């Protein structure tokens, strides 16, 4: 059982981060993922909880109005949404700390991911505050693997594969391993698959099932590449503009959503495998040579992250390793 930490209410960043907005009649919370993926379930749970607490909130899955995780803070600052869910790795250009949870082969279980989350949470909150946002909750993803047109279990099968990755680290790792990798928003994947310009997708069974990737990619290699996070944020001015009861409803719903998301991950892997089998997906394991190739390629990527993340990032990795 993963321990869900009890945490104090987050202090609100100063309103100097942006002009305080007029109190809205209700909030919207967006994610680029489908309603059936675990982040989509999270925004729905949050919306229901906050609404029950007296603040009307509408959940908007599937990338409403072109929303993408990489533009999370811009969307909040522009007032497009009051809150958003974002895949953490997509925010690596804002702060390298957001790449931490998707570093390859760093975590091997939900418990590992939770421990790394606890160590990194203050840094995530501080990075969000610098962007005029408040960290609301975290969502774990099941482990990442390769959705492919043909089985990919050997280095030869990976070589030249046109594969979507979800962040700059994944792109570097898979290129070093011989693939033709590029980082794409998950919302762009279907169009590229339909056009035939993509052979494979780095994602979890959860994300792939949400988009029914088996329509194009009927094989999944269980590489256990990473157990990454999505993070949810609110615009600090929107949160500060609420009356005390409204702020309490948001923060209580966020805490309940965090607990729900980390409890849900426990059975998610088995449930995803069942759905994949029911839809004819072939499940494969990488052979020892491919595992070795990926781990070797990952070492330099992790070292590059360590060098770019500064003392704070290195301290988190050291504490995690200890």
Where are these regions (language model features)?
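A gly/proline- and charged-residue-enriched helix-loop-helix capping module
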Residues: 111-121
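N-terminal secretory/targeting leader peptides
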Residues: 2-4, 10-15, 21-110, 128-322
């Amino acid at each position: 059982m993963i321990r869900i930490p009890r945490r104090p209410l987050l202090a609100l960043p100063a309103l100097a981060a942006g002009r305080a907005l007029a109190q809205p009649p209700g909030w919207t919370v967006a994610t680029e993922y489908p309603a059936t993926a675990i982040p989509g379930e999270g925004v729905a749970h949050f919306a229901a909880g906050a609404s029950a607490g007296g603040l009307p909130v509408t959940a908007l899955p599937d990338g409403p109005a072109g929303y993408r995780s990489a533009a999370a803070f811009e969307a909040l600052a522009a007032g497009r949404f009051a809150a958003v869910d974002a895949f953490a790795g997509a925010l690596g250009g804002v702060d390298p700390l957001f790449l931490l949870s998707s570093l390859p082969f760093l975590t091997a279980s939900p418990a590992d991911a939770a421990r790394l989350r606890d160590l990194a949470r203050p840094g995530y909150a501080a990075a969000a505050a610098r962007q005029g946002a408040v960290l609301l909750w975290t969502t774990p993803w099941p482990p990442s693997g390769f959705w492919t047109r043909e089985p990919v279990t050997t280095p030869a099968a990976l070589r030249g594969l046109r594969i979507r990755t979800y962040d700059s680290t994944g792109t570097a790792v898979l290129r070093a391993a011989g693939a033709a990798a590029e980082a794409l928003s998950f919302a762009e994947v279907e169009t590229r698959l339909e056009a035939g310009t993509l052979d494979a997708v780095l994602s979890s069974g959860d994300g792939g099932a949400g988009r029914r990737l088996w329509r194009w990619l009927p094989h999944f290699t269980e590489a256990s590449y990473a157990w990454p996070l999505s993070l949810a944020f609110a615009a600090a001015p929107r949160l500060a503009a609420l009356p005390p009861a409204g702020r309490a409803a948001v923060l209580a719903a966020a805490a309940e959503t965090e607990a729900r998301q980390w409890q849900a991950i426990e059975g998610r892997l088995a449930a995803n495998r069942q759905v994949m089998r029911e839809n004819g997906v072939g499940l494969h394991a990488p052979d020892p040579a491919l595992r070795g190739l990926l781990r070797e390629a990952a070492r330099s990527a992790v070292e590059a992250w360590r060098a770019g993340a500064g003392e704070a990032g290195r301290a988190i990795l050291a504490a995690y390793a200890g």
